[in-house]
Amino acid sequence: MSTDIATQLKGSRSDVEKVRKTVEAKFRELSGDGLPLRYEVNVLRHICLALKDNLHQNSDLYCDIMGIMLPRVVPCEEKPSLWEAHLSSLRYIHHGLFHQRSIEACQKLYNLIRQQPCRLQEESDYKIYLDIHLTHFNGFHVLLQKQKLPLEATSQLCYALESLGDLFAAMTQRQISLCATLLVQLNESLFGKRSRSFFKSLSFLPSESLAKMFNALLMLLASSTSSNLANLFPECLSLTLALVQIDMFSPQSNQQMSLQLLRMSKELFRQESNLCYALQLMYYYIKLIFVREPTGDFKRTYIDLSSKFQHFFEHKVASHAKEQWLADFLVAIQLLQVLIHQSNSKLQSPFQIFWQQFDGESSPEIYTAHFQLLQTCASLAVNITRSPLGCSCSHEACKSVRRHCILAYGLCALDAYINWKPAAEQRANVSPHKPLLGVVKYSMDVAKTMKCLGPTSVEIIKLVRQLTYVADQVTCPEQMSVLLPLLEPLQKLRPLVADQDMSSLLRRLFKASSHCGDSNIACRIQASYLASITNPARLRSQVCLYYHNLGKKGTEIKRCVYEWHESTPLPFPLTPDQKKQLYDTDFFALLHYLRSPSTAHMESLIRCRTSDYHLVLLARQMRKDDSISKKCIEVHDKLRQQRSLSRMDNLCLGHASVGLLLDALEAQKTKVSTKEITENMFEELLLSKNLWQMNIQREQRLVNYASEAISAFSNFFDRADQEPLSANETSIDWEALIDDAIATANALSSMGYQSEEDDAWLLLLRMGRLLEDRFTYLRALNHFLSQNEVSSRLNLKLGEEVEVAEELLDDLWPQLKNGKFFKRQQTTVMLCFCHLASYYARMECYSHAQLLLLHVEQLREEFPERQGKSDIVLLTLQTVRFRIGYQQRKPTNCRLPTPLRQLDILLDNVRSFCNLSSLDGGSLQLLLSTLVRESTECSANRLSERLSFSNIALHLVLQSGLALRAIEVFLAWLWTNLQMESFDKAQSKLRLIEHCLGIKQLNPTSRPEKEAIKDVAISDLASNMHLLQLVEPIRKQQLLNMASPNLLKMRPHSPNPQLDLDRYITLDVAPANLRENSQLQCLYFVTGCLHARLRFLQRNSEQLEEFYGRAHNWMQEKPPMSSALYPMLHAQQLYHLNYLRFARKHVEAISTAQLGLKMRSRAVDINFEYNFLAQLKTAQLELKPVGQDKPQVKILRRALVFNHSPEDKKRTATGSVSAVKNTASKVKQSAKKAPRFRIYEELELRPPSATSCSSSGGSGTENTPPSDHVDLNACQAIEISDDDDSPLVSTKKTQPKSREKAKPKATSKACKVLTLDNSLEIVETPTITTSTRSTRARLRQPVETPKTATLSSKRTRRQVLEAQAPETESISTRTRHRH
């Protein structure tokens, strides 16, 4: 039969039906105690085999078969094993149906089991029942969690609990005392180490089912014997904790099964005093945490209970510290603390009232007691080795319950502190901080030894988040003092903390650090957070905000963020790239964000620097620090000694060279008062202070620094493609690179070294184009636009650059009014327009140039801050107009002021200069250098002194110690002195130039006082001549063997007049740096030309023939250098021409004049052309003079009268004659012993242009002895006219129209030579008629026209008529230009 049943159970459904019928029939036949059970066990075994083969399709029929058998079987007294086999088979089938997901069959079978009474034949049978009930409970709880059959699952859970109650009652009835084993299985399978969700779902089951199970369990435990108490204690604690969780969520607040269990347990362990007292303490503690209403004595009760706990642990159990029950009790307390602290933040927490009563009055005291309790438990937990209550770590390397317990105590302490909401006055109470820090620090120290912890560990994540929350709640220094001691232990856990969690904590600490009492600690904490930011943009903004907040508080920045981070108690681990990013961000924040960083801050960055590049950039901010300067010198020397330099090395060398350049420029500056800038005190001034060291040799060191910088920067850009920068290199500070390049270019421009400054500005032009820096590009282009001619060496196509600049300007100038540009940028744009106008004027596009200047005027008027002020834009605009005016061949606007008047206006504006931007000061200095050259050229060609620009420029260059610029000013001054024939001043300028060139130092002896002239006659004559005219026209009338009064006493240290002039060409005595520099050679050559002119004017023509010949050859052999001379080239040609006429080499003079006319550049004064024309015509006349009658000796008819004042013009003719008589009488009295004079009369046939222009290019042939032809350089009446309405003198001898009486026509007879002896006779004075000018004519400014430019010298200042003389005698006049 067994074989048939086994086969049929594994067969089809009909076969199983047959088995059911067979079993039903069989049980009708069987009777007795043992046979039904034996047969039933056999059938159950075959059903188990069928389920084993996964044949669960007929599980419902299997349950029907078991439903037939179960009610008919009972335990067999003779065979206990059969009942055990019966229960085991039922358990197997129940488990098998659950595993095979036969839920309905499982429910059906379980109902069959629970419908039968619980029969425990043996004591061990309860285990099978217990296993069946727990399996059924856990299985349907899983279904309930998955929301599958929720109603049925809930019913099955209740059935299981009720069945457990029946089991516990049966055990009590059978007096089975194996409670410890039962509780172990219950805790392992049902209550122990379950989740909160399990207990929450269990608490919501019907209370009747729970009560039935729990009451039966309590009765069973109460009947336990004392022999099993040792094993029962930890299980009771475990069950208590489970019931506490059930009570937490139970809707019936008065149930509190955990307290019932503890009351029963106290009775159970009453013989064990320590265990009983421990359970009693736990009972009261749990009772206190389940308080449902606020009580007035809660704080006192809790403090008292905590003190009892501490007393119990410290005194009563001191001798039992290592016993197992104490370890279990400490673990139980830890688990209980975890329970009550986990729910403290929930609004509907069952312990909400418990935690609420911690607040209010005496809040610090109760929290102190709570923290002390946790600290005491944590300190005793060190003796825990094992405990069944302890959590089982999933990590194989960690089996320590002790470490997890201690860590849990620390987390609970932090939870309690987070829950604390102290009042404002309670925050200052730090009494709870000590026990809190004790337990937390201890737990953190233990955590670092745990091998199971990592970035994903729950404990570490919770610890960091708790600290984050604590930091977020900081509102005072006392609360911040809780966090500070925890930072160092936390740093030891840093490898276990995830970067995201640490970043969040550091962010809260960053905010909380504002309440830190120690500013240094606050900076360290803030640095930790800043280091944790990996996003470059966010890091930059946060670092800048950090410095902004420090500056807002007025706190001095002592260290950089990078250095603070290195010393912080909680450093953020950084990779080398992240460290570099942090330092670079901190570094550039100081450079670009902080306006005036502290020295300590910059020194901190220097200490932490990773390359020399950082040092040289910071040195730009620390020019006055000697130690930094020494370090820069060391870097500079080190880089110069290296054979090959990388791109970054070149960049460092460039910045270091600029730093040394600026330091040297600053060191040579001195204060010079404007009162000291007087022409007769120049030599004494240069011998004072540190100006005596001002020479080209000293300045060459500065030029070398600047050249090194430009060369290094150029190499950095040239090798960009061959040597790209790697990601590890420091970020390039392009702004600092541009600034230093501009500073170098400005320094070279200020010093005046043309070739070097061209290279610097060309590099800036490239940089502006490559970096798309529009304003740098325009600023560099301004330099080349302002030049008369760009050097071909640069290979610069200026026309193409102008096209690019015009596109940029078209885009920029409409935006200038928006207010988004700085004033220096506005200035750059407007200056570019001005220089473009100058460029187009050189291209003879005068209309376009004037339109550009008009556009600048209109654009400038749109800025209120510039209106009514003399800014650099206005000065540049007026300078360009002045340049266009005095260089233009055919002026188009006749109403423009004359060039000299424009210079006066420009001078007034320079004196009232207003500095509006950082660009204006340097631009003004460069503009003044140009104005010195151009104003000197303009005024010298018009025989006028305009020394104010030279005075201002000299003041600036002397204060800056610029030797080359000083030489240029002295050369311009020397040119003016020679034109005005101030020989002593000219000799002084030569000495000053030689001093600055380093050829001959000035004599440091004091300046000798000028000796008085003993000859009274000569003294009176000199004083009279000085008053009459500063150009000393009477000097040209003295005898050839008489020395000039100005030259009677030469200064001891004047340039040796016998010194060879060829030295200026051969450079025999010149220093080495002068022989190597073409620009210095040009200046030295110009000095020689002016020195030769001085020799000529001093009647010393001994070496002039050879010098002018060699000078001509020098200019022919060196065209680039000669073309760089500009106006001095034409002046030298005029000087040479004067000498040739003096030497009667008229053919050569004519060729020289013609060559000068052909070589005239567009960038020189138009008067040079007129002077060449005048000299050419004069030389032609001298070559073929007009026939002359023999001169007749006549008596002197009148004395020489010069420079009538405007008041004299109002006098009558009689008054004028009287004045002339008085003057002649005075001259006669003062010159009784004076030498003879030779006075020539004017020829009627002499061309007016020859007489009017002969002195424009120089002094003419002053030393030409009397000859058969008329001397063209004879003394002429000086003609100065300010009258705009004065008629122009035509080339013909026509009678001019006048409102006054018409002038008589002069006779056409030739002048006769009059010989005077030592005494002058007073003869009848001719009548003089003066043309009266209107008041309006005197007030108006002269208007220059093309005709007046050439013929203004013909305007008659005064007309002397001799009505009674039969032959009218007229004194030959020598005019000088005044336009």
From Swiss-Prot:
It comes from the Eukaryota. Keywords: Cell cycle, Cell division, Cytoplasm, Developmental protein, Mitosis. Residues 1031-1037 are annotated as: Separase cleavage-site. Residues 1213-1228 have a biased composition (Polar residues). The keyword Cytoplasm applies. Changing residue 1035 to D: Abolishes proteolytic cleavage. GO terms for cellular component: cytoplasm. This is Protein three rows. Required specifically for chromosome disjunction during all mitoses; maternally provided protein is sufficient until mitosis 14 then zygotic protein is required. Involved in formation and/or maintenance of epithelial structures: bud extension during Malpighian tubule development, and foregut and hindgut morphogenesis. GO terms for biological process: cell division; digestive tract mesoderm development; foregut morphogenesis; gonad development; head involution; hindgut morphogenesis; Malpighian tubule morphogenesis; mitotic sister chromatid segregation. Interacts with pim and Sse. Cleavage of thr contributes to inactivation of Sse. It comes from Drosophila melanogaster (Fruit fly). During embryogenesis, expressed in Malpighian tubule buds, and epithelia of foregut and hindgut. The keyword Ligase does not apply. The gene is thr. It is found in: Cytoplasm. Residues 1248-1267 have a biased composition (Low complexity). Proteolytically cleaved after the metaphase-to-anaphase transition, C-terminal cleavage product is degraded. Cleavage can only proceed within complexes that contain active Sse. Residues 1206-1231, 1248-1309, 1328-1379 are annotated as: Disordered. The lineage of its organism: Eukaryota, Metazoa, Ecdysozoa, Arthropoda, Hexapoda.
